[in-house]
Amino acid sequence: MTNNRSPAFTLIEMLVVLAVIAIMMSMTYPVYTTISQRAKATKDMSNLRQIALATQMYMNDNSNVFPGSATQTWMSQLELNQKYLSVWRILESPFDKRSTSESGDGTTAISYGINSNIYVSNVPISADKITKPTVFIVFAPTQESGSTVSFQGLGNSAVPGIGVLAATSTPGGTVTGGTHNNRAKINALFADWHVETMAWSGTGPAFTHTTDPGSDPDAPYRWSP
């Protein structure tokens, strides 16, 4: 009598199949993570470019002076009646995992900071005061201190608004790395309005370089006008 039953998988065969699936997943996950990181970095640069356009329009209306004052934050001035920024969400980095709102208050996540050195007693300087616009950083992601990428800036932050200075964050402390590429890279917006991906640290031009003009002649001008 002929046996028409299909042969079943043996336990060993099933284990082999599961092992192959596990290997394939372990190979594809890093690729997925890399693609996701690149997409976020691209979106982050796009946000900074939109902030650049908004800031330029604001400065054109205000004698070439940067936003922010002793009574108003730079964020609120850029988003004033949606005149320069259409939505608050542009001020949230894709690396910021917090939920946000369009209220412009304590429920609104702010991920970017303005270079604190453009203010003198909370009064912003004119762009004409910047010695080297091509190397002077104006805006960058403003992280809180810690071993992971995180942010805590809010729409109701104190005037003149959330700032950033080299490897420090406001509010926060000392940041331990960039936002992407295993915290080795960070995007920044410069005073000539170009956006650049920078190394977090190193022997050449780097985000945290402020005291080594030997390997980076422009270091003194990166954070100081």
Spans of features found by a protein language model:
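Short, well-structured segments within or immediately adjacent to enzyme catalytic domains
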Residues: T42-P225
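Amphipathic alpha-helical segments typified by the pilin-like N-terminal helix
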Residues: T2-S46
